[in-house]
């Protein structure tokens, strides 16, 4: 009899201070896909060097919204750093989108960016360049090795919390003060 598989989709991974990988140190990542082939997520608290206005310009999409043009594009992870990923919260689905949970979607479709530029897109959206990927069993091993804490995703944390506060606030949701933890782990 096989064990049921636990999905990590719609969970936030919070890097513990002992995280050995510099791509994820003090990082918060939303898991968007998780199955027997591996996992995919987007880092939510690393700003890239680009604004959304610069990305839209490169794509030939114009917008009159100064707020949209000034929005920081996230550095979503080391995999496909030249590819755009949009995480949005909406009742409407734009282009091919992956349901993460409870009205939260991930897409690489240009349609959602064009709709946002026109003012008809989702009002709550994050844009990232790149993503994070884990081979089959790799993320589970990292969890066992105490590299990550895990909490359910929360739209307020994703869309209403400043980038520099997401790491500590995510951990605070389960009562953990990351600044009180050491940067090494041990096993009994």
UniProtKB/Swiss-Prot annotation:
GO cellular component: cytosol
Cited Pfam families: DUF179 (PF02622)
Domain of life: Bacteria
Assigned protein family: Belongs to the UPF0301 (AlgH) family.
Name of the protein in question: UPF0301 protein Xfasm12_1428
Lineage of source species: Bacteria, Pseudomonadati, Pseudomonadota, Gammaproteobacteria, Lysobacterales
